[in-house]
Amino acid sequence: MDKYAVFGNPIKHSKSPFIHTLFARQTMQDLEYSAIEAPINGFVESVTAFFSQQGKGCNVTVPFKEEAFQFADQLTERAKLAGAVNTLKKLDDGIILGDNTDGEGLVQDLLQYQVPLEDKHILLIGAGGAARGVILPLLKQNPASITLVNRTYEKAKQLAELFSPYGRIEAKKMSDINKGFDVIINSTSASLSGELPQIDPVIFSGGAISYDMMYGSGKTIFNQWALKNDAYQAYDGLGMLVGQAAESFTVWRGLRPGSKQILRELRKT
């Protein structure tokens, strides 16, 4: 039986084994998927041991995505630009391929909700690893523009410059934002810390779609704020989690599983 896993620390909370077990059942693939808590300073040793013991592929979550980027022998274009890897696959020749499926997970979730991205004005809040991983897939949807804002403007500016060859993207200071957008994506952990970005809620005016990469049992704090300020609709990041998992599964098995049923199951728990 082919072995797969997710590496992280902590990892007990991970929904990945549940998701991939359902994907395997749905696509009739014979595999096992486990959660492995690697020591903070022992990711390389743990993942090397996993691949030497017939491991076929793995997901990587915090805090090891940058280490996985360094560990991979070969990188996809989206992983190179993301600067982080969340999916490793052992190829037939023993080469370890590093990929990043986070952005594809976000885009697929937005499209599943029938959120149009082409020719739309997108505001991306945050300039950390989560933002960096989704910019290229968003640009590939041909939006009219992506505006990047961050608490530290310089970080947003550097990220906008990195991705400028791939599409229309610019960085702005939060204090300079004074208009509405079509789609607002929050890549910060604001909802977990109970804080809100220091930005004018006018961004939601005119029926914007709000998307928070965080998720919880109810509406996230960011999405509550969005709806209170005239956002048309608000979605959390649980579908992105399922979407990136589906993309990883496709990378490993060459089959794309359906996400809707799994998302329904997760909403029940």
Curated annotation (Swiss-Prot):
<feature type="binding site">
    <location>
        <position position="237"/>
    </location>
    <ligand>
        <name>NADP(+)</name>
    </ligand>
</feature>
<dbReference type="GO" id="GO:0009423">
    <property type="term" value="P:chorismate biosynthetic process"/>
</dbReference>
<dbReference type="Pfam" id="PF18317">
    <property type="entry name" value="SDH_C"/>
</dbReference>
<dbReference type="InterPro" id="IPR041121">
    <property type="entry name" value="SDH_C"/>
</dbReference>
<dbReference type="InterPro" id="IPR046346">
    <property type="entry name" value="Aminoacid_DH-like_N_sf"/>
</dbReference>
<dbReference type="GO" id="GO:0004764">
    <property type="term" value="F:shikimate 3-dehydrogenase (NADP+) activity"/>
</dbReference>
<feature type="binding site">
    <location>
        <position position="77"/>
    </location>
    <ligand>
        <name>NADP(+)</name>
    </ligand>
</feature>
<dbReference type="InterPro" id="IPR011342">
    <property type="entry name" value="Shikimate_DH"/>
</dbReference>
<feature type="binding site">
    <location>
        <position position="215"/>
    </location>
    <ligand>
        <name>shikimate</name>
    </ligand>
</feature>
<keyword id="KW-0521">NADP</keyword>
<keyword id="KW-0560">Oxidoreductase</keyword>
<dbReference type="Pfam" id="PF01488">
    <property type="entry name" value="Shikimate_DH"/>
</dbReference>
<feature type="binding site">
    <location>
        <position position="102"/>
    </location>
    <ligand>
        <name>shikimate</name>
    </ligand>
</feature>
<dbReference type="InterPro" id="IPR006151">
    <property type="entry name" value="Shikm_DH/Glu-tRNA_Rdtase"/>
</dbReference>
<keyword id="KW-0057">Aromatic amino acid biosynthesis</keyword>
<feature type="active site" description="Proton acceptor">
    <location>
        <position position="65"/>
    </location>
</feature>
<feature type="binding site">
    <location>
        <begin position="150"/>
        <end position="155"/>
    </location>
    <ligand>
        <name>NADP(+)</name>
    </ligand>
</feature>
<comment type="pathway">
    <text>Metabolic intermediate biosynthesis; chorismate biosynthesis; chorismate from D-erythrose 4-phosphate and phosphoenolpyruvate: step 4/7.</text>
</comment>
<comment type="similarity">
    <text>Belongs to the shikimate dehydrogenase family.</text>
</comment>
<dbReference type="GO" id="GO:0009073">
    <property type="term" value="P:aromatic amino acid family biosynthetic process"/>
</dbReference>
<keyword id="KW-0028">Amino-acid biosynthesis</keyword>
<dbReference type="InterPro" id="IPR022893">
    <property type="entry name" value="Shikimate_DH_fam"/>
</dbReference>
<dbReference type="Pfam" id="PF08501">
    <property type="entry name" value="Shikimate_dh_N"/>
</dbReference>
<feature type="binding site">
    <location>
        <begin position="14"/>
        <end position="16"/>
    </location>
    <ligand>
        <name>shikimate</name>
    </ligand>
</feature>
<dbReference type="GO" id="GO:0019632">
    <property type="term" value="P:shikimate metabolic process"/>
</dbReference>
<dbReference type="InterPro" id="IPR036291">
    <property type="entry name" value="NAD(P)-bd_dom_sf"/>
</dbReference>
<dbReference type="GO" id="GO:0050661">
    <property type="term" value="F:NADP binding"/>
</dbReference>
<comment type="function">
    <text>Involved in the biosynthesis of the chorismate, which leads to the biosynthesis of aromatic amino acids. Catalyzes the reversible NADPH linked reduction of 3-dehydroshikimate (DHSA) to yield shikimate (SA).</text>
</comment>
<protein>
    <recommendedName>
        <fullName>Shikimate dehydrogenase (NADP(+))</fullName>
        <ecNumber>1.1.1.25</ecNumber>
    </recommendedName>
</protein>
<feature type="binding site">
    <location>
        <position position="213"/>
    </location>
    <ligand>
        <name>NADP(+)</name>
    </ligand>
</feature>
<dbReference type="GO" id="GO:0008652">
    <property type="term" value="P:amino acid biosynthetic process"/>
</dbReference>
<feature type="binding site">
    <location>
        <position position="86"/>
    </location>
    <ligand>
        <name>shikimate</name>
    </ligand>
</feature>
<feature type="binding site">
    <location>
        <position position="61"/>
    </location>
    <ligand>
        <name>shikimate</name>
    </ligand>
</feature>
<dbReference type="InterPro" id="IPR013708">
    <property type="entry name" value="Shikimate_DH-bd_N"/>
</dbReference>
<comment type="subunit">
    <text>Homodimer.</text>
</comment>
<feature type="binding site">
    <location>
        <begin position="126"/>
        <end position="130"/>
    </location>
    <ligand>
        <name>NADP(+)</name>
    </ligand>
</feature>
<dbReference type="GO" id="GO:0005829">
    <property type="term" value="C:cytosol"/>
</dbReference>
